[in-house]
């Protein structure tokens, strides 16, 4: 009997860089140059958006897991379009009564494209040390007794 699982099947379609991020109260598996439909964002088309709530980041050499988020990791997104999802029908009825109610809902979505995933270092802090100012206090004079 042969093993049908190959090591190449376990890879992520040849992409060695991906990230799991949190947006709109959900977690998404993001890969570079792919489209994703997420809940409506308040942004115009062609706008750039940065996600900083990265839960996991995998690159060629390592996997970084955040506690809860990966520090200094970013995902750059570009808004492609705004659209509406398929209609979901909700049908409510009360048995033995003539009460029926049919409603529909269409979720507002934003289609985004992942431009880059990066684990950048934060901007270097200035090398100047903070100087502490010491106040000189006068010693308390002894109380005079008259």
From Swiss-Prot:
PROSITE patterns reported for this sequence: RIBOSOMAL_L21
Listed GO biological process terms: translation
Query: In its keyword annotation, does this UniProt entry include Ribonucleoprotein?
Result: yes
Q: Name one Pfam family in it.
A: Ribosomal_L21p
Stretches with biased composition (Basic and acidic residues): 128-146
Q: Does the keyword Ribosomal protein apply?
A: yes
The segment annotated Disordered runs over 115-146
Q: Which GO terms describe its molecular function?
A: rRNA binding; structural constituent of ribosome
Ordered alphabetically, the record's keywords are: Ribonucleoprotein, Ribosomal protein, RNA-binding, rRNA-binding
Family annotation (InterPro entries): bL21-like, bL21-like_sf, Ribosomal_bL21, Ribosomal_bL21_CS
Disulphides:
none
- Gene Ontology cellular component annotations, sorted alphabetically: cytoplasm; ribonucleoprotein complex; ribosome
Q: What role is this protein assigned?
A: This protein binds to 23S rRNA in the presence of protein L20.
Complex and partners: Part of the 50S ribosomal subunit. Contacts protein L20.
Entry similarity comment: Belongs to the bacterial ribosomal protein bL21 family.
Q: What is this protein called?
A: Large ribosomal subunit protein bL21
Q: What gene is it encoded by?
A: rplU
């Amino acid at each position: 009997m042969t093993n049908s699982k190959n090591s190449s099947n376990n890879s992520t379609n040849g992409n060695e860089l991906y990230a799991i991020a949190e947006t709109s109260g959900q977690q998404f598996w993001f890969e570079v140059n792919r489209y994703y439909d997420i809940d409506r964002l308040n942004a115009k088309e062609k706008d750039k958006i940065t996600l900083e709530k990265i839960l996991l980041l995998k690159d060629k050499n390592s996997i970084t897991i955040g506690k809860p988020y990966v520090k200094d990791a970013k995902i750059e997104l570009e808004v492609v379009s705004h659209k509406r999802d398929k209609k979901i029908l909700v049908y409510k009825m009360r048995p033995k009564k003539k009460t029926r109610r049919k409603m529909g809902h269409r979720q507002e979505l934003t289609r985004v494209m992942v431009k880059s995933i990066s684990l950048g270092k934060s901007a270097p802090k200035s090398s100047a040390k903070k100087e502490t100012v010491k106040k000189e206090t006068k010693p308390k004079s002894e109380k005079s007794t008259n």
